[in-house]
Protein backbone atom coordinates (compact mmCIF):
# COMPACT_ATOMS: atom_id res chain seq x y z
CA UNK A 1 0.00 0.00 0.00
CA UNK A 2 2.80 2.46 0.75
CA UNK A 3 4.44 1.94 -2.64
CA UNK A 4 1.05 2.47 -4.29
CA UNK A 5 0.50 5.75 -2.42
CA UNK A 6 3.97 7.01 -3.25
CA UNK A 7 4.32 5.90 -6.88
CA UNK A 8 0.74 5.53 -8.16
CA UNK A 9 0.01 6.82 -11.66
CA UNK A 10 -3.20 6.31 -13.63
CA UNK A 11 -1.25 5.40 -16.76
CA UNK A 12 -1.38 6.78 -20.29
CA UNK A 13 -5.00 5.72 -20.84
CA UNK A 14 -6.19 8.16 -18.15
CA UNK A 15 -5.07 11.12 -20.23
CA UNK A 16 -7.99 11.42 -22.61
CA UNK A 17 -7.54 15.15 -23.26
CA UNK A 18 -5.12 17.94 -22.42
CA UNK A 19 -7.65 19.40 -19.99
CA UNK A 20 -7.46 16.39 -17.64
CA UNK A 21 -3.66 16.32 -17.23
CA UNK A 22 -3.57 18.43 -14.05
CA UNK A 23 -6.51 16.55 -12.56
CA UNK A 24 -4.88 13.15 -13.20
CA UNK A 25 -1.46 14.28 -11.92
CA UNK A 26 -3.09 15.60 -8.73
CA UNK A 27 -4.32 12.04 -8.05
CA UNK A 28 -0.87 10.55 -8.65
CA UNK A 29 1.55 9.49 -5.94
CA UNK A 30 4.00 11.86 -4.25
CA UNK A 31 7.13 10.70 -6.08
CA UNK A 32 5.35 10.88 -9.46
CA UNK A 33 4.25 14.44 -8.65
CA UNK A 34 7.88 15.32 -7.92
CA UNK A 35 8.83 14.27 -11.47
CA UNK A 36 10.33 10.81 -10.92
CA UNK A 37 9.93 8.32 -13.75
CA UNK A 38 9.89 4.61 -12.96
CA UNK A 39 9.09 2.75 -16.15
CA UNK A 40 8.57 -0.78 -14.88
CA UNK A 41 8.21 -0.23 -11.15
CA UNK A 42 11.75 -1.42 -10.50
CA UNK A 43 12.51 1.27 -7.96
CA UNK A 44 9.54 0.32 -5.82
CA UNK A 45 10.30 -3.39 -5.97
CA UNK A 46 14.05 -3.19 -5.48
CA UNK A 47 14.13 -0.47 -2.83
CA UNK A 48 11.52 -2.32 -0.76
CA UNK A 49 13.44 -5.58 -1.18
CA UNK A 50 16.74 -3.90 -0.29
CA UNK A 51 15.36 -2.36 2.89
CA UNK A 52 13.79 -5.68 3.89
CA UNK A 53 17.08 -7.46 3.17
CA UNK A 54 19.11 -4.97 5.20
CA UNK A 55 16.75 -5.20 8.16
CA UNK A 56 16.76 -9.00 7.96
CA UNK A 57 20.56 -9.16 7.69
CA UNK A 58 20.96 -6.80 10.63
CA UNK A 59 18.60 -8.85 12.77
CA UNK A 60 20.11 -12.24 11.86
CA UNK A 61 23.75 -11.13 12.08
CA UNK A 62 26.85 -12.41 10.31
CA UNK A 63 26.91 -15.82 8.65
CA UNK A 64 28.67 -18.60 10.48
CA UNK A 65 32.15 -18.86 8.97
CA UNK A 66 31.93 -15.50 7.17
CA UNK A 67 35.35 -14.56 5.79
CA UNK A 68 36.87 -17.92 6.74
CA UNK A 69 35.02 -20.43 4.56
CA UNK A 70 34.32 -20.34 0.85
CA UNK A 71 30.68 -19.62 0.02
CA UNK A 72 30.79 -20.98 -3.53
CA UNK A 73 27.49 -21.96 -5.13
CA UNK A 74 26.51 -25.61 -5.30
CA UNK A 75 26.34 -25.72 -9.10
CA UNK A 76 27.66 -23.06 -11.47
CA UNK A 77 25.73 -24.75 -14.27
CA UNK A 78 22.44 -24.24 -12.47
CA UNK A 79 23.50 -20.70 -11.55
CA UNK A 80 24.01 -19.87 -15.23
CA UNK A 81 20.76 -21.56 -16.26
CA UNK A 82 18.91 -19.61 -13.59
CA UNK A 83 20.42 -16.28 -14.57
CA UNK A 84 19.71 -16.99 -18.26
CA UNK A 85 16.07 -17.76 -17.47
CA UNK A 86 15.87 -14.62 -15.36
CA UNK A 87 17.31 -12.56 -18.21
CA UNK A 88 14.81 -13.98 -20.73
CA UNK A 89 11.90 -13.48 -18.35
CA UNK A 90 12.96 -9.91 -17.65
CA UNK A 91 12.30 -9.01 -21.29
CA UNK A 92 8.62 -9.70 -20.71
CA UNK A 93 8.63 -7.77 -17.45
CA UNK A 94 10.25 -4.63 -18.86
CA UNK A 95 8.71 -4.63 -22.34
CA UNK A 96 5.35 -5.69 -20.94
CA UNK A 97 5.31 -2.63 -18.70
CA UNK A 98 4.57 -0.53 -21.80
CA UNK A 99 1.10 -2.17 -21.70
CA UNK A 100 1.01 -2.50 -25.50
CA UNK A 101 3.28 -3.48 -28.38
CA UNK A 102 4.68 -0.11 -29.40
CA UNK A 103 7.93 1.83 -29.59
CA UNK A 104 8.25 2.06 -25.80
CA UNK A 105 8.01 -1.72 -25.51
CA UNK A 106 10.67 -2.16 -28.20
CA UNK A 107 12.92 0.41 -26.52
CA UNK A 108 12.49 -1.30 -23.15
CA UNK A 109 13.30 -4.67 -24.73
CA UNK A 110 16.46 -3.40 -26.44
CA UNK A 111 17.59 -1.44 -23.39
CA UNK A 112 17.12 -4.49 -21.19
CA UNK A 113 19.41 -6.49 -23.45
CA UNK A 114 22.14 -3.84 -23.81
CA UNK A 115 22.24 -2.79 -20.15
CA UNK A 116 22.46 -6.39 -18.98
CA UNK A 117 25.15 -7.25 -21.50
CA UNK A 118 27.13 -4.15 -20.50
CA UNK A 119 26.85 -5.08 -16.82
CA UNK A 120 28.09 -8.62 -17.54
CA UNK A 121 31.05 -7.21 -19.46
CA UNK A 122 31.94 -4.57 -16.87
CA UNK A 123 31.69 -7.05 -13.99
CA UNK A 124 33.82 -9.57 -15.91
CA UNK A 125 36.45 -6.99 -16.89
CA UNK A 126 36.61 -5.65 -13.34
CA UNK A 127 36.93 -9.14 -11.94
CA UNK A 128 39.64 -10.03 -14.48
CA UNK A 129 41.60 -6.90 -13.60
CA UNK A 130 41.28 -7.51 -9.87
CA UNK A 131 41.59 -11.31 -9.62
CA UNK A 132 43.36 -12.16 -12.86
CA UNK A 133 40.41 -13.95 -14.46
CA UNK A 134 36.67 -13.58 -14.86
CA UNK A 135 34.25 -16.16 -13.47
CA UNK A 136 30.89 -17.57 -14.48
CA UNK A 137 29.48 -16.62 -11.07
CA UNK A 138 30.64 -13.06 -11.72
CA UNK A 139 28.94 -13.04 -15.12
CA UNK A 140 25.68 -14.22 -13.57
CA UNK A 141 25.97 -11.61 -10.82
CA UNK A 142 26.67 -8.91 -13.40
CA UNK A 143 23.58 -9.95 -15.36
CA UNK A 144 21.36 -9.61 -12.31
CA UNK A 145 22.93 -6.23 -11.49
CA UNK A 146 22.24 -4.98 -15.01
CA UNK A 147 18.66 -6.24 -14.98
CA UNK A 148 17.89 -4.55 -11.68
CA UNK A 149 19.58 -1.30 -12.70
CA UNK A 150 17.81 -0.86 -16.05
CA UNK A 151 14.29 -1.74 -14.93
CA UNK A 152 13.19 1.74 -13.76
CA UNK A 153 14.68 3.40 -16.85
CA UNK A 154 14.06 0.77 -19.53
CA UNK A 155 11.54 2.79 -21.52
CA UNK A 156 12.88 6.24 -20.64
CA UNK A 157 16.50 6.23 -21.89
CA UNK A 158 18.18 5.61 -25.21
CA UNK A 159 20.57 2.79 -25.97
CA UNK A 160 23.57 4.90 -24.91
CA UNK A 161 21.93 5.52 -21.54
CA UNK A 162 21.24 1.81 -21.17
CA UNK A 163 24.88 0.98 -21.89
CA UNK A 164 26.02 3.57 -19.34
CA UNK A 165 23.60 2.26 -16.70
CA UNK A 166 24.76 -1.31 -17.33
CA UNK A 167 28.46 -0.46 -17.20
CA UNK A 168 28.00 1.53 -14.01
CA UNK A 169 25.86 -1.19 -12.40
CA UNK A 170 28.40 -3.92 -13.16
CA UNK A 171 31.31 -2.00 -11.64
CA UNK A 172 29.30 -0.63 -8.70
CA UNK A 173 27.92 -4.03 -7.71
CA UNK A 174 31.31 -5.71 -8.07
CA UNK A 175 32.99 -3.27 -5.71
CA UNK A 176 29.93 -1.95 -3.84
Language model: regions and residue ranges:
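Hydrophobic alpha-helical transmembrane bundles of multi-pass membrane proteins
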Residues: 1-176
